[in-house]
Amino acid sequence: MSTGRTLAYGALGLPLAFAALPIYVHVPRLYAEHAGLALGLLGGLLLVARLLDAFSDPVLGWLADRLPKRGLIAAALLPLGAGFFLLMHPVEQNPALWLGVALVLTYLGFSAATIAYQAWGADLGADAGSRTRLVAAREGLGLLGVLLAAALPSLLAPNLADGLATLAWIF
């Protein structure tokens, strides 16, 4: 497999990793400070969303084995993008419900995209060497996504809420 195709495959690793970090690093502070949610409630919502994710992942894996991977990835990016955008724009009315719905959408889309993406990489590699290069491209660009997600909110705006709102538009 050519270097260009390997990097093209790995490119999706950047936005997927870009989406994951803010949920744990920035969202609790954002919802505590700007929506007034108690940290215990925030932790509970994050836990429930992840527990739902634990039940959906086997189903998503089963689907990834039976459906075209690229189509599943494309379909998964819709709830991921919508959920991420909603997460970064807390509302004043019912912020806990808003956060819960946004987390479920984000996690569902993220899990579906990630599971299908990793399965697709296994399918693309003709041998162990090519699969290793695909994983290296995916993980290397994913690391770049983590670095960008960590740095951009503070570089984009003088406060967390505005930085995350801008980050959501970039995503």
Regions found by a protein language model. Name each.
Residues 1-171:
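Membrane-embedded alpha-helical bundles of multi-pass transporters/translocases
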